[in-house]
Amino acid sequence: MKQAITGTIILALFIAVVNLYPRYQKKYEPPLRLHRLPPTLALEIMSVGNKELMAEIIFYNTEFYFGEKVGWREETPELRRLYDALNKATDLDPYNIDCYYFAQGALSWVKPAIPYLNRLLEKGLKHRTWDWYLPFFLSANYYFQLKQPVKAAEYLKLASRLNPRSSLFATLTARMFYEGNETEAGIAYLRSLIKDTQNPLLRKRLAKRLKALEAIRYLELALEKYESKYKQKAKSLGDLVKAGLIESIPPDPYGGKFYLTKDGKVYTTSKLAEGWQKKKNDPDKN
């Protein structure tokens, strides 16, 4: 009986600490910072010939920061610093796939970060010449964010050549370049990325974006039905509800509201965007 009471008390205390500590942390502790690393040459000297180990330490420190910052404290991560750390880690060890995968998962939907991210992936592609993931990531970045389908097709073709057994590339190629449906291509891309992502926090963030794209596609299909039925385009998403094609406008996982633009496209006030701090100094120069 005493053991049961003791166990209950311990469990209650544990639950209280787990729930109350984040509030205490947010109120009294300063925001978690990712400290800027010294130049790559200095890191190389500090590694004493163990560049791969130094790169791995930087990667795990960055991943821990991201998990603590986003998953536990629910604060906005310093994505520019995160990129800088991963860039220097791959300067030390350009074969480290963890850095490239993590960078793609964290930065690929932040449009101002794409030129930096692509340079990082290009660096990896020069060394990991057998790895189909890197041209696959580059293809997605050029298509979805930079709106350069020809460039995207080049990288997708390379990814297909490196991994000829995958049916994903045929699906993406059809949706990107023949059917012209960017939303469906994005859904296919995210499902593939989620399937292969090991980091649970990144998987959660990608799943959130997937949910948003699925909501957009749901509305796009309803708009197509409306136009087919009434021989005219809907003026607002509310018309879909009035016509009985959908019960209600789905919520945006990012907290915004979906709306219909003048040219008939579904957008959201949240822009599905993450933050990227602009700084005068380019971290690539270090």
Residue ranges and their predicted role:
Residues 50-71, 92-108, 129-144, 165-176:
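Amphipathic alpha-helical repeat scaffolds of TPR domains
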Residues 109, 123, 185-286:
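Low-complexity, acidic interaction segments enriched in glycine
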